């Protein structure tokens, strides 16, 4: 895959005078929750409403998402607010259901990016799609894996591509939930300067007080947008141990 100015076309088509903003809850929990958040966001700079329908968890027994019923809530968000919609997909069935419910943007999560098998399955299911497809960096700082995921999607004739930087896992003590390791997305940006690059400060920070700092750094580095988790009331989200997140 070579850099191509056409890679930016889908982003340019938004005709924005500010960075692209994708926002919404980490997880879809109820229809009322989704609609409340979407209605708060619709008058802002947010262009795309995000919500996790299926949630990959480290251990069984944790909340793994509401499942396909949440796709109907995304449809309602789109119909009533005019916002485009986005969700994470991790297999071919997720892709099929998301497309059936007219989700506009599909992203591949960091835990999926680490597996060429998973990325290829998703790429095959998306072959030739006109949906916007975003791929997060792998959880470990392996730029080759990220390149490989991008190339697999591009080889499946997916034209509306972008990447999301969400930081990297580390055993070292850090103020960040996932270390940004800015040199890695910068290297990707140097290789593909026209591939839209979005920062996910929520996953990098893991706490609200760092969001502005990380968001500003990404924009100073010429990132094209932000993906931010947004909640109306943190005390009511399904993961009370992570109420410091936004």
List the predicted regions and their residue ranges.
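Active-site mouth loops of central-metabolism enzymes
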Residues: 20-34, 60-62, 85-88, 110, ...
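Short, acidic/polar
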Residues: 31-40, 90-96, 210-215
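Hydrophobic faces of well-ordered beta-strands that scaffold small-molecule active sites
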Residues: 20-24, 47-51, 85-87, 106-108, ...
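Alpha-helix-loop-beta-strand connector modules within alpha/beta enzyme cores
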Residues: 64-86, 125-132, 184-194, 242
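N-terminal amphipathic alpha-helix/helix-capping segment at the start of soluble metabolic enzymes
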Residues: 1-22
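Catalytic alpha/beta core domains of metabolic enzymes, predominantly
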Residues: 118-233
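N-terminal active-site wall of soluble small-molecule enzyme domains
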Residues: 51, 55-107, 116-118
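Single conserved hydrophobic/aromatic residue that forms the stacking wall/gate
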Residues: 235-246
